[in-house]
Amino acid sequence: MGYWISEFVRVLFGYVFMMYLWPSVIFRKKLSGKSLTFRFAFCSTVSILLVNTAVLGLGLVHMLKGWLIACIFYGILIISVLKNKELRASFFLLFRALFAGTLGGKTLIFRMIYNIKKCIIRTIRCLDKKTKGRKLEYSVLSVLIIFAVAYFSYGAFQCHSYGWGDMYVHHAWIYGLKEGKIFSEGVYPEAMHCFVYCMNVLFGIPVYSCLLFMGEIHVSALIVAVYCLFREVMKSKYTVYLILAAFLTVDVVCVDEIYGISRLQYTIPQEFGLYTQFLCALYLICFIRRNPKSDGEKKKGIDKNLFLFTTSLAASIVIHFYVTIMAFFLCASFALLGITRIFRKENFRPLVVAVIAGGVISTTPMILAFATGTPLQGSLNWGMNIINGTDTKEGRTQVAQNISEENSEEENSEEENSIKKSTDISSEIQENQITTSENKDMTQQIENNAAVQKHFSVKGMVQKIIDNIKLVYKYGYAQLYGEERAGWIIRFTLLSLALGVLNLIVYFIRLKKFPFEMYLGITFASVLFMILYAAPFLGLPEIIAGARLCLTEQILLFAMMAVPFDGLFFLFEKTKAARFSPFLSLLGVASIYAGTHYFGIFHGYLYYELTRYNSVVEVTNSIIENCPKYQYTIISTTEELYQAIESGRHEEILDFYNRSKQEKYIIPTEYLFFYVEKKPIQYAQYHFFTGPRWLAQAKYTKFYKYSNAVLSEGDEIANSQISEFLLNEPITITGKASDAYSNIKNREILESEMYFWCQKFKMHFPNEIKVYYEDEDFICYVVKQNTDHLYDLSD
């Protein structure tokens, strides 16, 4: 565990340096006098854009080298620091004394440490001044951030493998950057890959450790971005603490939501970029709200809100297109009631320019790469899937179509019965009435006209809207939250809507103009994202996979439900007791935490897609540390390739199985490590964690009882057993090795073949093969061979 804690600290340091410290030093003049919110938004977006542009720019001219990246980033940092006259004079004075022989090396180090200490003290004092009068607020926010990071990183300390299959793909793309190849698998937003690559180059942190921990650490950026947005749009600046506390403690009751929230544990592009959508909305709102006549920055041709909107938009594009789409809908929800302000001359033109600038900044490297012959990455075909109405891997379009067809068949059946019944009645009437043909023709014409009028009537349109609302409720609210919770959400939605309308009326009566109302914006956003989730069931294209919307929708729903409490906070702040508002927010956060425990709705532990035992990870680490670089080969399933790729070689167990049946088969490294699962693991099982009840509870497995997923929890792992009876059994052929291992029968056969091959090798060379590690689930054999006389590994 000590190793993983140290790796977590290294990743944390590298992340803070790259995301915040480096841009804070480089742009200290730009940031001087700015608020903490501005500093956060600036650093967290500009750093991403600079890293992405630098790495991809060098890659486009085939100059992407680790040493060059280090020279650029450290060089810019040193030059920026030395621009300070005091620091420059101190630096040159120290080194002049060192080279003159009047200053020893130890003294130089102590003096440099002293100067660094002075800088830290100065920074702390500056921070103290910035947070004056708000220390309790920031303390509560810090506790919430620490709790969030602890909750989402808990799994990485329990299971040291990647938690999601996509992470192996992203690792491969990052390794492509290490080899100097950008867009190694096709044109795709690479900002996250570039960021991890720079952490690896600048600090020597293994890519494996970066991907294992950075996503959980980056949750802090999401929490702060949500904090900044709702602190701005709510009438009370303390309501946002209730929103964050509810998001971090209240449980969920649907597998889509569990999946959506679990994704925050993984270092993958969409979740890495989620914070940018909230920053886009924040600075669009701030830009629309501003008063240009009193804005001093207008004279300079600069608007800080528009600048940060541009950088946030650009950052969302370079990280993941889904995030940009979500940012669009989030911004549209808030901007709807400020539409007249947007189309003002002083707003519309700058906004259009900002959007174009954001698009150009972010897409230029991708466009240039595509223009020079690099194809698009396969996952970008989602656009064509939307146009064609076909499913993505996570899509529900086909499911929705099947349900729609079933409903149509039921309706048609009912309609046929109704027609048959009406026909029987008409027959009886015709038997008892004698009518002329003229009357029949007239009656038919009247009926046709009535049918046409009914079809195009307002009543029909209203009925269509009502039907769609019912579908959104059924396949959105009720599906995600169950009937009881969905009922409460609808009540809060109506209440928030009423409060928003009331605010509009009061403001209009007082000032004779319509305000840019935020309560309605929050409510519209929560409803719009629910419509996006239920889109395929409404006959609309599924622009974003529903499960990926759940996390943002969860935050928006809590924000909407906090609107009535925001009104109460606002009224409380107008009284003489307003000075107790920070303590009231602290009490609210504590009450939510205690209440979720008391009412049994405290959130549960999340899951990883388990692909290997922890002992396998630890053994691989041991091999990496103790064996010479590239002088060993690990023969195992695919996962070890990514952990050891920077220092060793890897042979797929499936390839070993096939090649060992050839006439001759050698592996040209000094050390061979054979990994054998004595109990073959059920590949990609949903492994739920267990742990202390103050952090979370074990409660989510019950929601998977009707799914096909293989589940495990805590110390229990779903696995099988190797056997001699499985030798020479046929293996199911698959497209690639990793797919073969997901079939438990294949895995049993391959692990059995490997185990008994090692036993056979031991019979022939008893002193050459040794057990490197063994427990009840896993065994690792090692063979040391003479590279001049390699062993023939064929049967």
Task: Specify the residue positions occupied by each region the protein language model found.
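Signature aromatic-anchored transmembrane alpha helix within multi-pass, membrane-resident enzymes
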Residues: 352-362, 566-600
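Alpha-helical transmembrane segments at the extracellular/periplasmic loop-to-helix junctions
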Residues: 5-22, 220, 271-278, 446-509, ...
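Extracytoplasmic
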Residues: 174-175, 585-667
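Membrane-interface helix-loop-helix junctions at transmembrane boundaries of multi-pass membrane enzymes
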Residues: 128-135, 237-239, 294-303, 342-352, ...
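Perimembrane helix-loop-helix junctions
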Residues: 326-359
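Active-site lumenal/periplasmic loops and adjacent helix-entry segments of GT-C-fold
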Residues: 130-276, 296, 552, 609
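Membrane-embedded, hydrophobic transmembrane alpha-helices
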Residues: 1-131
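Membrane-helix boundary/interfacial segments in multi-pass membrane proteins
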Residues: 60-66, 157-167, 179-182, 203-204, ...
